[in-house]
Amino acid sequence: MDNEQRLKRRENIRNFSIIAHIDHGKSTLADRILENTKSVETRDMQDQLLDSMDLERERGITIKLNAVRLKYEAKDGNTYTFHLIDTPGHVDFTYEVSRSLAACEGAILVVDAAQGIEAQTLANVYLALDNELELLPVINKIDLPAAEPERVKQEIEDMIGLDQDDVVLASAKSNIGIEEILEKIVEVVPAPDGDPEAPLKALIFDSEYDPYRGVISSIRIVDGVVKAGDKIRMMATGKEFEVTEVGINTPKQLPVDELTVGDVGYIIASIKNVDDSRVGDTITLASRPASEPLQGYKKMNPMVYCGLFPIDNKNYNDLREALEKLQLNDASLEFEPESSQALGFGYRTGFLGMLHMEIIQERIEREFGIELIATAPSVIYQCILRDGSEVTVDNPAQMPDRDKIDKIFEPYVRATMMVPNDYVGAVMELCQRKRGQFINMDYLDDIRVNIVYELPLAEVVFDFFDQLKSNTKGYASFDYEFIENKESNLVKMDILLNGDKVDALSFIVHRDFAYERGKALVEKLKTLIPRQQFEVPVQAAIGQKIVARTNIKSMGKNVLAKCYGGDISRKRKLLEKQKAGKAKMKAVGNIEIPQDAFLAVLKMDDE
Protein backbone atom coordinates (compact mmCIF):
# COMPACT_ATOMS: atom_id res chain seq x y z
CA MET A 1 0.00 0.00 0.00
CA ASP A 2 1.49 3.39 -0.92
CA ASN A 3 1.21 6.53 1.18
CA GLU A 4 -1.63 7.98 -0.86
CA GLN A 5 -3.78 4.89 -0.19
CA ARG A 6 -2.79 5.00 3.46
CA LEU A 7 -3.91 8.62 3.77
CA LYS A 8 -7.17 7.84 1.98
CA ARG A 9 -7.76 4.90 4.30
CA ARG A 10 -6.98 7.09 7.31
CA GLU A 11 -9.90 9.39 6.43
CA ASN A 12 -12.32 6.47 6.91
CA ILE A 13 -11.02 5.27 10.28
CA ARG A 14 -12.98 6.04 13.46
CA ASN A 15 -11.46 5.16 16.84
CA PHE A 16 -13.83 5.35 19.78
CA SER A 17 -14.57 3.83 23.15
CA ILE A 18 -17.70 3.47 25.24
CA ILE A 19 -17.73 5.07 28.68
CA ALA A 20 -20.43 4.78 31.33
CA HIS A 21 -21.20 4.19 34.98
CA ILE A 22 -21.34 0.52 36.11
CA ASP A 23 -24.48 -1.25 34.86
CA HIS A 24 -25.58 1.43 32.40
CA GLY A 25 -25.26 -1.08 29.57
CA LYS A 26 -21.83 -0.56 27.95
CA SER A 27 -21.11 -4.21 27.21
CA THR A 28 -24.61 -4.81 25.82
CA LEU A 29 -24.24 -1.79 23.52
CA ALA A 30 -20.86 -3.14 22.38
CA ASP A 31 -22.56 -6.49 21.59
CA ARG A 32 -25.23 -4.73 19.47
CA ILE A 33 -22.62 -2.69 17.58
CA LEU A 34 -20.74 -5.91 16.78
CA GLU A 35 -23.98 -7.54 15.63
CA ASN A 36 -25.18 -4.65 13.48
CA THR A 37 -21.84 -4.25 11.70
CA LYS A 38 -21.97 -8.03 10.97
CA SER A 39 -18.56 -8.36 12.64
CA VAL A 40 -19.51 -11.56 14.40
CA GLU A 41 -21.28 -14.58 12.93
CA THR A 42 -24.71 -15.00 14.52
CA ARG A 43 -23.69 -18.46 15.75
CA ASP A 44 -20.66 -17.02 17.60
CA MET A 45 -22.64 -14.24 19.23
CA GLN A 46 -23.02 -14.39 22.98
CA ASP A 47 -23.80 -11.78 25.63
CA GLN A 48 -20.87 -9.66 26.83
CA LEU A 49 -18.82 -10.86 23.88
CA LEU A 50 -15.88 -8.60 24.63
CA ASP A 51 -15.73 -9.64 28.30
CA SER A 52 -13.46 -12.59 27.70
CA MET A 53 -12.68 -13.53 31.32
CA ASP A 54 -15.02 -15.99 33.08
CA LEU A 55 -14.83 -13.71 36.07
CA GLU A 56 -16.19 -10.77 34.02
CA ARG A 57 -19.17 -12.81 32.84
CA GLU A 58 -19.98 -14.13 36.31
CA ARG A 59 -19.89 -10.74 37.97
CA GLY A 60 -21.41 -9.00 34.96
CA ILE A 61 -18.71 -6.31 34.99
CA THR A 62 -15.93 -5.36 32.60
CA ILE A 63 -12.48 -5.56 34.15
CA LYS A 64 -10.08 -5.51 31.20
CA LEU A 65 -10.29 -3.20 28.25
CA ASN A 66 -10.76 -4.90 24.87
CA ALA A 67 -10.16 -3.59 21.35
CA VAL A 68 -11.91 -4.82 18.21
CA ARG A 69 -12.00 -3.76 14.53
CA LEU A 70 -15.35 -3.48 12.71
CA LYS A 71 -16.33 -2.64 9.14
CA TYR A 72 -19.37 -0.39 8.65
CA GLU A 73 -21.07 0.54 5.39
CA ALA A 74 -22.50 3.99 6.01
CA LYS A 75 -25.46 5.60 4.26
CA ASP A 76 -23.08 7.92 2.37
CA GLY A 77 -21.86 4.85 0.46
CA ASN A 78 -18.39 4.70 2.05
CA THR A 79 -17.08 1.77 4.07
CA TYR A 80 -15.62 2.87 7.40
CA THR A 81 -13.21 1.04 9.69
CA PHE A 82 -14.27 1.33 13.32
CA HIS A 83 -11.98 0.48 16.22
CA LEU A 84 -14.12 -0.04 19.29
CA ILE A 85 -12.28 -0.10 22.61
CA ASP A 86 -14.48 -1.39 25.43
CA THR A 87 -13.72 0.00 28.90
CA PRO A 88 -14.57 -0.91 32.51
CA GLY A 89 -16.79 1.39 34.59
CA HIS A 90 -15.82 0.65 38.20
CA VAL A 91 -13.88 3.32 40.10
CA ASP A 92 -10.99 0.87 40.77
CA PHE A 93 -10.40 0.50 37.05
CA THR A 94 -10.18 4.17 36.07
CA TYR A 95 -6.64 3.42 34.89
CA GLU A 96 -7.96 0.95 32.30
CA VAL A 97 -10.35 3.67 31.09
CA SER A 98 -7.61 6.30 30.76
CA ARG A 99 -5.55 3.82 28.71
CA SER A 100 -8.44 3.14 26.35
CA LEU A 101 -9.14 6.83 25.86
CA ALA A 102 -5.51 7.56 24.97
CA ALA A 103 -5.98 5.37 21.88
CA CYS A 104 -9.20 7.09 20.68
CA GLU A 105 -10.51 10.28 19.07
CA GLY A 106 -14.07 9.95 20.35
CA ALA A 107 -16.20 8.34 23.03
CA ILE A 108 -19.80 7.18 23.26
CA LEU A 109 -21.14 8.36 26.60
CA VAL A 110 -23.83 5.93 27.75
CA VAL A 111 -26.33 7.11 30.38
CA ASP A 112 -29.10 4.97 31.86
CA ALA A 113 -32.56 6.42 31.05
CA ALA A 114 -33.84 5.58 34.54
CA GLN A 115 -30.77 6.33 36.69
CA GLY A 116 -29.52 9.43 34.91
CA ILE A 117 -25.99 10.77 35.28
CA GLU A 118 -24.02 9.22 38.15
CA ALA A 119 -20.72 10.02 39.85
CA GLN A 120 -18.70 7.63 37.71
CA THR A 121 -20.25 9.00 34.50
CA LEU A 122 -18.92 12.44 35.38
CA ALA A 123 -15.48 11.12 36.34
CA ASN A 124 -15.18 9.38 32.95
CA VAL A 125 -16.44 12.47 31.09
CA TYR A 126 -13.66 14.56 32.67
CA LEU A 127 -11.13 11.90 31.65
CA ALA A 128 -12.44 12.02 28.07
CA LEU A 129 -12.30 15.83 28.00
CA ASP A 130 -8.72 15.75 29.32
CA ASN A 131 -7.88 13.57 26.32
CA GLU A 132 -9.69 16.05 24.02
CA LEU A 133 -12.17 13.46 22.76
CA GLU A 134 -15.42 14.21 20.94
CA LEU A 135 -18.39 12.95 22.98
CA LEU A 136 -21.47 11.25 21.53
CA PRO A 137 -24.18 11.09 24.22
CA VAL A 138 -26.50 8.05 24.18
CA ILE A 139 -29.41 7.48 26.56
CA ASN A 140 -29.75 3.71 26.94
CA LYS A 141 -32.58 1.52 28.28
CA ILE A 142 -35.36 3.85 27.03
CA ASP A 143 -37.78 0.89 26.96
CA LEU A 144 -37.65 0.45 30.75
CA PRO A 145 -40.90 1.29 32.56
CA ALA A 146 -38.98 3.72 34.82
CA ALA A 147 -37.21 5.47 31.93
CA GLU A 148 -37.32 9.28 31.84
CA PRO A 149 -35.37 10.19 28.69
CA GLU A 150 -36.48 13.85 28.67
CA ARG A 151 -35.26 14.44 32.25
CA VAL A 152 -31.94 12.70 31.49
CA LYS A 153 -31.52 14.78 28.30
CA GLN A 154 -31.88 17.92 30.38
CA GLU A 155 -29.29 16.55 32.87
CA ILE A 156 -26.81 15.88 30.08
CA GLU A 157 -27.22 19.46 28.87
CA ASP A 158 -27.05 21.04 32.35
CA MET A 159 -24.28 18.95 33.90
CA ILE A 160 -22.03 18.07 30.97
CA GLY A 161 -22.90 20.89 28.58
CA LEU A 162 -23.71 18.73 25.53
CA ASP A 163 -26.58 19.84 23.30
CA GLN A 164 -29.88 17.96 23.84
CA ASP A 165 -30.39 17.64 20.08
CA ASP A 166 -27.21 15.54 19.76
CA VAL A 167 -28.46 12.91 22.20
CA VAL A 168 -29.37 9.51 20.68
CA LEU A 169 -32.16 7.56 22.40
CA ALA A 170 -31.47 3.83 22.37
CA SER A 171 -32.07 0.48 23.95
CA ALA A 172 -29.17 -1.88 23.43
CA LYS A 173 -31.19 -4.86 24.66
CA SER A 174 -34.05 -4.30 22.21
CA ASN A 175 -31.77 -3.12 19.37
CA ILE A 176 -33.39 0.35 19.21
CA GLY A 177 -31.35 3.32 17.94
CA ILE A 178 -28.20 1.32 17.11
CA GLU A 179 -28.26 2.31 13.41
CA GLU A 180 -28.44 5.97 14.41
CA ILE A 181 -25.48 5.56 16.80
CA LEU A 182 -23.36 4.05 13.99
CA GLU A 183 -24.19 6.96 11.65
CA LYS A 184 -23.40 9.46 14.42
CA ILE A 185 -19.99 7.83 14.99
CA VAL A 186 -19.10 8.53 11.35
CA GLU A 187 -20.33 12.11 11.70
CA VAL A 188 -19.09 13.10 15.19
CA VAL A 189 -15.83 11.19 15.75
CA PRO A 190 -12.95 12.80 13.81
CA ALA A 191 -10.61 10.75 11.61
CA PRO A 192 -7.18 10.22 13.19
CA ASP A 193 -4.33 12.64 12.46
CA GLY A 194 -0.90 11.32 11.70
CA ASP A 195 1.61 11.00 8.88
CA PRO A 196 2.40 7.59 7.32
CA GLU A 197 5.78 8.94 6.12
CA ALA A 198 6.93 10.10 9.56
CA PRO A 199 9.03 7.80 11.80
CA LEU A 200 6.93 5.11 13.48
CA LYS A 201 5.20 6.04 16.73
CA ALA A 202 2.86 3.48 18.30
CA LEU A 203 1.33 3.62 21.77
CA ILE A 204 1.11 0.35 23.72
CA PHE A 205 -2.22 0.51 25.54
CA ASP A 206 -2.48 -3.10 26.68
CA SER A 207 -0.43 -6.27 26.63
CA GLU A 208 -0.93 -9.90 27.51
CA TYR A 209 1.33 -12.91 27.85
CA ASP A 210 1.01 -15.98 25.66
CA PRO A 211 3.19 -18.93 26.73
CA TYR A 212 3.87 -19.86 23.07
CA ARG A 213 4.22 -16.51 21.31
CA GLY A 214 5.54 -14.37 24.15
CA VAL A 215 4.15 -10.91 24.82
CA ILE A 216 1.27 -9.72 22.62
CA SER A 217 0.98 -5.92 22.77
CA SER A 218 -2.14 -3.98 21.74
CA ILE A 219 -1.04 -0.82 19.96
CA ARG A 220 -2.46 2.32 18.36
CA ILE A 221 -0.39 3.66 15.45
CA VAL A 222 -0.04 7.45 15.59
CA ASP A 223 2.60 7.99 12.87
CA GLY A 224 4.35 5.72 10.39
CA VAL A 225 3.88 2.07 9.38
CA VAL A 226 4.90 -1.23 10.99
CA LYS A 227 5.04 -4.70 9.41
CA ALA A 228 6.45 -8.15 10.13
CA GLY A 229 10.25 -8.25 9.80
CA ASP A 230 10.75 -4.65 11.04
CA LYS A 231 13.19 -4.10 13.88
CA ILE A 232 11.45 -2.08 16.59
CA ARG A 233 12.71 -0.22 19.65
CA MET A 234 10.90 0.39 22.94
CA MET A 235 11.47 4.06 23.77
CA ALA A 236 11.30 3.65 27.56
CA THR A 237 13.86 0.83 27.83
CA GLY A 238 15.77 1.23 24.53
CA LYS A 239 15.51 -2.53 23.91
CA GLU A 240 15.14 -3.77 20.33
CA PHE A 241 13.12 -6.68 18.92
CA GLU A 242 12.20 -8.11 15.53
CA VAL A 243 8.49 -8.09 14.68
CA THR A 244 7.18 -11.58 13.89
CA GLU A 245 3.51 -10.71 13.35
CA VAL A 246 1.18 -7.72 13.21
CA GLY A 247 -2.59 -8.09 13.15
CA ILE A 248 -6.03 -6.88 14.10
CA ASN A 249 -8.70 -8.12 16.49
CA THR A 250 -11.99 -8.98 14.83
CA PRO A 251 -12.64 -10.13 18.00
CA LYS A 252 -10.38 -13.08 16.96
CA GLN A 253 -6.75 -12.25 16.19
CA LEU A 254 -6.16 -11.96 12.46
CA PRO A 255 -2.65 -11.35 11.01
CA VAL A 256 -2.35 -8.53 8.40
CA ASP A 257 0.48 -7.25 6.16
CA GLU A 258 0.94 -3.92 7.91
CA LEU A 259 -0.50 -1.54 10.48
CA THR A 260 -0.53 2.11 9.48
CA VAL A 261 -1.68 5.53 10.74
CA GLY A 262 -4.83 5.36 12.86
CA ASP A 263 -4.84 1.56 13.10
CA VAL A 264 -5.50 -0.24 16.34
CA GLY A 265 -4.13 -3.78 16.38
CA TYR A 266 -1.62 -6.08 18.01
CA ILE A 267 2.09 -6.73 17.53
CA ILE A 268 4.16 -9.81 18.41
CA ALA A 269 7.94 -9.51 18.49
CA SER A 270 9.07 -12.61 20.43
CA ILE A 271 9.35 -10.52 23.59
CA LYS A 272 9.81 -12.99 26.42
CA ASN A 273 10.15 -10.67 29.37
CA VAL A 274 7.12 -9.01 30.83
CA ASP A 275 9.01 -5.79 31.69
CA ASP A 276 10.09 -5.14 28.11
CA SER A 277 6.62 -4.27 26.84
CA ARG A 278 5.26 -1.81 29.36
CA VAL A 279 1.81 -0.34 28.89
CA GLY A 280 2.09 3.38 28.05
CA ASP A 281 5.43 2.97 26.26
CA THR A 282 6.03 4.10 22.66
CA ILE A 283 7.26 1.71 19.94
CA THR A 284 9.42 3.12 17.15
CA LEU A 285 11.68 1.69 14.41
CA ALA A 286 15.29 0.96 15.35
CA SER A 287 16.52 2.11 11.90
CA ARG A 288 14.58 5.40 11.99
CA PRO A 289 13.57 6.22 15.56
CA ALA A 290 11.12 8.98 16.51
CA SER A 291 12.68 11.93 18.31
CA GLU A 292 10.43 11.82 21.37
CA PRO A 293 7.92 9.33 22.81
CA LEU A 294 4.17 9.87 22.83
CA GLN A 295 2.47 11.33 25.84
CA GLY A 296 1.73 8.17 27.87
CA TYR A 297 -0.84 8.34 30.61
CA LYS A 298 -0.45 9.20 34.22
CA LYS A 299 0.81 6.27 36.26
CA MET A 300 -1.75 5.13 38.80
CA ASN A 301 -0.26 4.48 42.21
CA PRO A 302 -1.66 1.68 44.37
CA MET A 303 -3.97 2.91 47.13
CA VAL A 304 -4.35 -0.29 49.14
CA TYR A 305 -1.76 -2.85 50.19
CA CYS A 306 -2.20 -6.35 51.55
CA GLY A 307 -0.04 -9.42 52.10
CA LEU A 308 -0.69 -12.43 49.83
CA PHE A 309 0.69 -15.70 51.18
CA PRO A 310 0.41 -19.15 49.56
CA ILE A 311 -1.27 -21.64 51.91
CA ASP A 312 1.37 -24.16 50.82
CA ASN A 313 4.82 -22.53 51.07
CA LYS A 314 6.07 -24.64 48.14
CA ASN A 315 4.00 -22.35 45.87
CA TYR A 316 6.02 -19.22 46.76
CA ASN A 317 7.80 -19.06 43.37
CA ASP A 318 4.63 -19.93 41.46
CA LEU A 319 2.93 -16.98 43.17
CA ARG A 320 5.70 -14.66 41.97
CA GLU A 321 5.26 -15.88 38.38
CA ALA A 322 1.49 -15.47 38.63
CA LEU A 323 1.85 -11.88 39.89
CA GLU A 324 4.36 -11.06 37.13
CA LYS A 325 2.00 -12.32 34.43
CA LEU A 326 -0.94 -10.38 35.86
CA GLN A 327 1.23 -7.28 36.19
CA LEU A 328 1.97 -7.41 32.46
CA ASN A 329 -1.44 -6.05 31.49
CA ASP A 330 -2.29 -4.52 34.82
CA ALA A 331 0.39 -1.90 35.24
CA SER A 332 -1.11 -0.60 38.48
CA LEU A 333 -0.35 -3.84 40.35
CA GLU A 334 2.81 -3.72 42.50
CA PHE A 335 4.39 -6.38 44.67
CA GLU A 336 7.51 -7.09 46.73
CA PRO A 337 8.56 -10.07 48.89
CA GLU A 338 7.47 -10.11 52.52
CA SER A 339 7.79 -12.59 55.35
CA SER A 340 5.53 -13.03 58.35
CA GLN A 341 6.11 -15.13 61.47
CA ALA A 342 2.53 -16.35 61.31
CA LEU A 343 2.24 -17.02 57.58
CA GLY A 344 5.74 -17.66 56.24
CA PHE A 345 6.87 -16.13 52.92
CA GLY A 346 4.61 -14.19 50.56
CA TYR A 347 4.27 -10.84 48.79
CA ARG A 348 3.17 -7.39 49.89
CA THR A 349 0.91 -6.41 47.02
CA GLY A 350 -0.48 -2.99 46.05
CA PHE A 351 -3.91 -2.46 44.45
CA LEU A 352 -6.09 0.43 43.28
CA GLY A 353 -8.96 -0.52 45.57
CA MET A 354 -10.84 -3.36 47.19
CA LEU A 355 -12.57 -4.67 44.05
CA HIS A 356 -9.21 -4.71 42.26
CA MET A 357 -7.78 -6.70 45.19
CA GLU A 358 -10.61 -9.26 45.15
CA ILE A 359 -10.36 -9.71 41.38
CA ILE A 360 -6.57 -10.25 41.45
CA GLN A 361 -6.91 -12.72 44.33
CA GLU A 362 -9.62 -14.63 42.49
CA ARG A 363 -7.64 -14.64 39.23
CA ILE A 364 -4.56 -16.08 40.98
CA GLU A 365 -6.64 -18.84 42.57
CA ARG A 366 -8.47 -19.66 39.31
CA GLU A 367 -5.96 -19.13 36.55
CA PHE A 368 -2.87 -20.36 38.40
CA GLY A 369 -4.43 -22.76 40.94
CA ILE A 370 -2.61 -21.25 43.95
CA GLU A 371 -4.56 -21.15 47.21
CA LEU A 372 -3.96 -17.89 49.08
CA ILE A 373 -4.33 -16.31 52.47
CA ALA A 374 -4.72 -12.52 52.27
CA THR A 375 -4.03 -10.27 55.25
CA ALA A 376 -6.14 -7.23 56.07
CA PRO A 377 -5.58 -4.40 53.57
CA SER A 378 -3.84 -1.22 54.67
CA VAL A 379 -3.12 2.16 53.08
CA ILE A 380 0.24 4.00 52.99
CA TYR A 381 1.17 6.12 56.01
CA GLN A 382 4.03 8.67 56.21
CA CYS A 383 5.77 8.79 59.60
CA ILE A 384 8.06 11.66 60.60
CA LEU A 385 10.38 10.36 63.33
CA ARG A 386 11.80 12.33 66.26
CA ASP A 387 15.25 12.36 64.63
CA GLY A 388 13.73 14.13 61.59
CA SER A 389 13.84 11.17 59.21
CA GLU A 390 10.79 10.04 57.24
CA VAL A 391 9.45 6.48 56.91
CA THR A 392 6.75 5.16 54.57
CA VAL A 393 4.66 2.36 56.07
CA ASP A 394 2.35 0.16 53.98
CA ASN A 395 2.37 -2.74 56.44
CA PRO A 396 1.14 -2.13 60.01
CA ALA A 397 3.67 -4.66 61.33
CA GLN A 398 6.50 -2.32 60.21
CA MET A 399 5.20 0.76 62.02
CA PRO A 400 8.03 2.19 64.21
CA ASP A 401 7.54 2.32 68.01
CA ARG A 402 5.21 5.08 69.17
CA ASP A 403 7.90 6.84 71.25
CA LYS A 404 10.11 7.26 68.15
CA ILE A 405 7.34 8.88 66.08
CA ASP A 406 6.80 12.63 65.99
CA LYS A 407 3.91 12.83 63.47
CA ILE A 408 1.89 10.41 61.33
CA PHE A 409 0.25 11.44 58.05
CA GLU A 410 -2.44 9.42 56.29
CA PRO A 411 -3.87 9.77 52.76
CA TYR A 412 -7.14 11.68 52.35
CA VAL A 413 -9.49 11.51 49.36
CA ARG A 414 -12.19 13.82 48.05
CA ALA A 415 -15.31 11.70 47.77
CA THR A 416 -18.18 12.80 45.54
CA MET A 417 -21.51 11.11 46.21
CA MET A 418 -24.74 11.52 44.27
CA VAL A 419 -27.68 10.58 46.46
CA PRO A 420 -31.47 10.97 46.39
CA ASN A 421 -32.75 13.79 48.68
CA ASP A 422 -34.36 11.40 51.17
CA TYR A 423 -31.04 9.83 52.12
CA VAL A 424 -28.89 12.93 52.65
CA GLY A 425 -29.04 12.59 56.45
CA ALA A 426 -28.01 8.92 56.42
CA VAL A 427 -25.08 9.60 54.08
CA MET A 428 -23.81 12.56 56.11
CA GLU A 429 -24.03 10.49 59.28
CA LEU A 430 -22.01 7.70 57.62
CA CYS A 431 -19.34 10.22 56.52
CA GLN A 432 -19.11 11.73 60.04
CA ARG A 433 -18.70 8.24 61.47
CA LYS A 434 -15.86 7.63 59.01
CA ARG A 435 -14.02 10.79 60.24
CA GLY A 436 -15.15 12.76 57.18
CA GLN A 437 -14.97 16.52 56.75
CA PHE A 438 -17.91 18.19 54.99
CA ILE A 439 -16.90 20.28 51.96
CA ASN A 440 -19.90 21.02 49.80
CA MET A 441 -23.48 20.12 48.92
CA ASP A 442 -25.24 20.82 45.63
CA TYR A 443 -28.89 20.22 44.75
CA LEU A 444 -28.72 19.02 41.13
CA ASP A 445 -32.51 18.92 40.69
CA ASP A 446 -35.49 18.23 42.93
CA ILE A 447 -34.53 14.58 43.40
CA ARG A 448 -30.76 14.37 43.69
CA VAL A 449 -28.00 15.95 45.72
CA ASN A 450 -24.27 15.97 45.06
CA ILE A 451 -22.37 15.74 48.37
CA VAL A 452 -18.61 16.25 48.65
CA TYR A 453 -16.60 15.10 51.68
CA GLU A 454 -12.93 14.73 52.48
CA LEU A 455 -12.37 11.31 54.03
CA PRO A 456 -9.36 9.28 55.19
CA LEU A 457 -8.63 6.68 52.50
CA ALA A 458 -8.32 4.01 55.19
CA GLU A 459 -12.01 4.49 56.02
CA VAL A 460 -13.06 4.45 52.35
CA VAL A 461 -11.27 1.38 51.05
CA PHE A 462 -12.80 -1.30 53.25
CA ASP A 463 -16.56 -1.23 53.18
CA PHE A 464 -17.54 2.40 52.69
CA PHE A 465 -19.10 1.72 49.30
CA ASP A 466 -21.17 -1.21 50.64
CA GLN A 467 -22.39 0.86 53.58
CA LEU A 468 -23.19 3.82 51.32
CA LYS A 469 -25.26 1.53 49.10
CA SER A 470 -27.12 -0.04 52.04
CA ASN A 471 -27.80 3.37 53.64
CA THR A 472 -29.36 4.63 50.39
CA LYS A 473 -31.12 1.41 49.29
CA GLY A 474 -28.62 1.12 46.45
CA TYR A 475 -29.35 4.52 44.88
CA ALA A 476 -26.14 6.38 45.70
CA SER A 477 -23.23 6.52 43.30
CA PHE A 478 -19.71 7.30 44.38
CA ASP A 479 -16.36 8.40 43.03
CA TYR A 480 -13.18 9.45 44.81
CA GLU A 481 -9.79 10.96 44.05
CA PHE A 482 -6.68 11.28 46.20
CA ILE A 483 -5.94 14.82 47.45
CA GLU A 484 -3.12 14.85 50.02
CA ASN A 485 -1.66 13.35 53.18
CA LYS A 486 -2.92 14.91 56.42
CA GLU A 487 -1.66 14.59 59.98
CA SER A 488 -3.72 12.22 62.16
CA ASN A 489 -3.62 10.85 65.69
CA LEU A 490 -3.07 7.20 64.79
CA VAL A 491 -1.83 4.25 66.81
CA LYS A 492 -0.80 0.73 65.91
CA MET A 493 -2.79 -2.03 67.57
CA ASP A 494 -1.22 -5.46 68.03
CA ILE A 495 -3.13 -8.67 68.63
CA LEU A 496 -1.55 -11.23 70.97
CA LEU A 497 -2.56 -14.89 70.95
CA ASN A 498 -1.33 -16.90 73.90
CA GLY A 499 1.03 -13.98 74.72
CA ASP A 500 2.64 -13.90 71.24
CA LYS A 501 2.14 -11.07 68.74
CA VAL A 502 0.54 -12.15 65.46
CA ASP A 503 2.11 -9.70 62.99
CA ALA A 504 -0.47 -10.39 60.29
CA LEU A 505 -3.33 -9.24 62.54
CA SER A 506 -1.84 -5.84 63.48
CA PHE A 507 -3.70 -2.79 62.22
CA ILE A 508 -3.50 1.01 62.43
CA VAL A 509 -6.42 2.85 63.98
CA HIS A 510 -7.34 6.38 65.11
CA ARG A 511 -6.70 6.76 68.84
CA ASP A 512 -10.32 7.81 69.51
CA PHE A 513 -11.62 4.49 68.16
CA ALA A 514 -8.81 2.27 69.44
CA TYR A 515 -10.56 0.90 72.53
CA GLU A 516 -13.84 -0.03 70.75
CA ARG A 517 -12.03 -1.54 67.75
CA GLY A 518 -9.72 -3.56 70.00
CA LYS A 519 -12.56 -4.84 72.17
CA ALA A 520 -14.74 -5.74 69.18
CA LEU A 521 -11.88 -7.52 67.42
CA VAL A 522 -10.84 -9.76 70.32
CA GLU A 523 -14.48 -10.79 70.78
CA LYS A 524 -14.73 -11.56 67.07
CA LEU A 525 -11.48 -13.56 67.07
CA LYS A 526 -12.76 -15.56 70.03
CA THR A 527 -15.54 -16.92 67.81
CA LEU A 528 -13.34 -17.47 64.73
CA ILE A 529 -10.24 -19.19 66.13
CA PRO A 530 -10.87 -22.90 66.79
CA ARG A 531 -10.73 -24.00 70.43
CA GLN A 532 -7.51 -25.70 71.50
CA GLN A 533 -6.76 -28.35 74.13
CA PHE A 534 -5.66 -25.48 76.39
CA GLU A 535 -7.06 -22.04 77.21
CA VAL A 536 -5.84 -19.28 74.85
CA PRO A 537 -5.89 -15.61 75.92
CA VAL A 538 -6.60 -13.13 73.05
CA GLN A 539 -5.37 -9.60 73.79
CA ALA A 540 -5.35 -6.26 71.96
CA ALA A 541 -2.44 -3.99 72.87
CA ILE A 542 -1.18 -0.50 72.02
CA GLY A 543 2.55 -0.62 72.71
CA GLN A 544 2.90 -2.27 76.14
CA LYS A 545 -0.62 -1.41 77.23
CA ILE A 546 -3.29 -4.12 76.96
CA VAL A 547 -6.60 -2.45 76.04
CA ALA A 548 -8.84 -5.53 75.68
CA ARG A 549 -8.72 -9.21 76.52
CA THR A 550 -10.82 -12.35 76.26
CA ASN A 551 -10.11 -16.08 76.60
CA ILE A 552 -10.82 -18.90 74.16
CA LYS A 553 -11.95 -21.72 76.46
CA SER A 554 -10.15 -25.05 76.18
CA MET A 555 -11.77 -28.16 74.78
CA GLY A 556 -12.33 -30.34 77.86
CA LYS A 557 -11.33 -33.96 77.46
CA ASN A 558 -12.91 -36.09 80.14
CA VAL A 559 -9.96 -38.11 81.48
CA LEU A 560 -12.17 -39.63 84.18
CA ALA A 561 -14.46 -41.34 81.68
CA LYS A 562 -12.87 -44.73 82.29
CA CYS A 563 -12.89 -44.50 86.09
CA TYR A 564 -15.93 -46.29 87.40
CA GLY A 565 -16.11 -45.69 91.15
CA GLY A 566 -12.65 -46.19 92.64
CA ASP A 567 -10.48 -44.06 94.85
CA ILE A 568 -10.47 -40.24 94.69
CA SER A 569 -6.66 -40.19 94.66
CA ARG A 570 -6.69 -42.16 91.37
CA LYS A 571 -8.94 -39.51 89.81
CA ARG A 572 -6.81 -36.72 91.22
CA LYS A 573 -3.69 -38.29 89.74
CA LEU A 574 -5.29 -38.35 86.26
CA LEU A 575 -6.46 -34.74 86.57
CA GLU A 576 -2.99 -33.57 87.73
CA LYS A 577 -1.43 -35.39 84.79
CA GLN A 578 -3.87 -33.69 82.37
CA LYS A 579 -3.13 -30.30 83.94
CA ALA A 580 0.63 -30.78 83.53
CA GLY A 581 0.13 -31.89 79.92
CA LYS A 582 -1.95 -28.79 79.17
CA ALA A 583 0.63 -26.47 80.73
CA LYS A 584 3.32 -28.05 78.57
CA MET A 585 1.10 -27.79 75.49
CA LYS A 586 0.39 -24.13 76.23
CA ALA A 587 4.13 -23.42 76.39
CA VAL A 588 4.84 -24.91 72.96
CA GLY A 589 1.34 -24.84 71.44
CA ASN A 590 0.95 -23.59 67.89
CA ILE A 591 -2.41 -22.03 67.09
CA GLU A 592 -3.83 -22.36 63.58
CA ILE A 593 -5.42 -19.11 62.46
CA PRO A 594 -8.15 -19.42 59.80
CA GLN A 595 -8.42 -16.95 56.84
CA ASP A 596 -11.66 -15.49 58.32
CA ALA A 597 -9.67 -14.21 61.28
CA PHE A 598 -7.48 -12.00 59.04
CA LEU A 599 -10.55 -10.56 57.37
CA ALA A 600 -12.22 -9.91 60.73
CA VAL A 601 -9.93 -6.89 61.09
CA LEU A 602 -11.86 -5.28 58.22
CA LYS A 603 -15.36 -6.13 59.17
CA MET A 604 -15.19 -4.39 62.55
CA ASP A 605 -17.54 -1.56 61.59
CA ASP A 606 -20.42 -3.86 60.81
CA GLU A 607 -20.98 -4.83 64.44
Swiss-Prot record:
InterPro entries attached to this UniProt entry: EF-4, EFG_III/V, EFG_V-like, EFTu-like_2, G_TR_CS, LepA_C_sf, LepA_CTD, LepA_IV
Enzyme Commission number: 3.6.5.n1
Entry's localization field: Cell membrane
PROSITE patterns associated with the record: G_TR_1, G_TR_2
GO molecular function: GTP binding; GTPase activity; ribosome binding; translation elongation factor activity
Binding site for GTP: 23-28, 140-143
EC main group: hydrolase
Keyword Nucleotide-binding recorded: yes
GO CC annotations, alphabetized: plasma membrane
Topology within the bilayer: Peripheral membrane protein
Alphabetized Gene3D superfamilies for the sequence: 3.30.70.240, Elongation factor 4, C-terminal domain, Elongation Factor G (Translational Gtpase), domain 3, P-loop containing nucleotide triphosphate hydrolases, Translation factors
Biological processes per GO annotation: positive regulation of translation
Record field: catalytic activity: GTP + H2O = GDP + phosphate + H(+)
Domain tr-type G: 11-193
Keywords annotated in UniProt: Cell membrane, GTP-binding, Hydrolase, Membrane, Nucleotide-binding, Protein biosynthesis
Similarity comment text for this entry: Belongs to the TRAFAC class translation factor GTPase superfamily. Classic translation factor GTPase family. LepA subfamily.
Function according to Swiss-Prot or TrEMBL: Required for accurate and efficient protein synthesis under certain stress conditions. May act as a fidelity factor of the translation reaction, by catalyzing a one-codon backward translocation of tRNAs on improperly translocated ribosomes. Back-translocation proceeds from a post-translocation (POST) complex to a pre-translocation (PRE) complex, thus giving elongation factor G a second chance to translocate the tRNAs correctly. Binds to ribosomes in a GTP-dependent manner.
Stated name of the protein: Elongation factor 4
Organism: Staphylococcus aureus (strain MW2)
Gene behind the chain: lepA
